[in-house]
Swiss-Prot record:
Subcellular location: Cytoplasm
One example GO MF annotation: zinc ion binding
Protein name: Protein SprT-like
HAMAP family linked: SprT_like
Primary residence: cytoplasm
Residues binding Zn(2+): H67, H71
Catalytic residues, chain numbering: E68
One GO location term (cellular component): cytoplasm
Cofactor note: Binds 1 zinc ion.
Organism: Shouchella clausii (strain KSM-K16)
Keywords: Cytoplasm, Metal-binding, Zinc
Cofactor: Zn(2+)
């Protein structure tokens, strides 16, 4: 899907579900990692994560667009557009938009380190500089053991 097709889809959804036109820009942003999309308050544009579309398809993308359009239309009307606001939650329910999107991360990995002195194991999501950090129990040297994949998304 191109940005032009995304723009047309967003305008169509806005008219169908909100009975209001979407007059700004909707585009894909490859730098989005932990979110499905975002509404930009200053420019009123909507940015969407292309990985959500690639991984979960058009239905999930439509749900994310509806969610961001709730932010968009409520903000332009001067009503509560934040997640905790009552107006926003009512509009989510009315349009059938999801409150959260599915996760976009490919896999969840854990790095396993062990102490060379006391054999204590450490499970971390981020790398540890073994030259700088030591065991919290005995101050022994840490050694990298393995990288485990907890679960892989399909």
């Amino acid at each position: 899907m191109t940005n032009k097709e995304l723009q047309q889809l967003t305008e169509t959804i806005s008219l169908a579900f909100f009975k209001r036109p979407f007059t700004h820009t909707a585009r894909f942003n490859n730098r989005l990692r932990t979110t499905g999309g975002r509404y930009l308050l200053k420019s009123h544009d909507i940015e969407l994560n292309p990985k959500q579309y690639e991984r979960y398809g058009k239905e999930e993308l439509i749900g994310i667009i509806k969610h961001e359009l709730c932010h968009y239309h409520l903000h332009l009307e001067g009503k509560g557009y934040k997640h905790g606001d009552k107006d926003f939650q009512e509009w989510l329910a009315k349009t059938g938009a999801p409150r959260y999107c599915k996760t976009a991360q490919d896999e969840q990995t854990v790095l396993v380190y062990t102490c060379t002195s006391c054999s204590r194991t450490y499970h971390r999501r981020r790398k540890i500089n073994t030259q700088k950090y030591v065991c919290g129990t005995c101050h022994g040297k840490l050694k990298f053991l393995s990288k485990k994949v907890l679960h892989q998304r399909k």
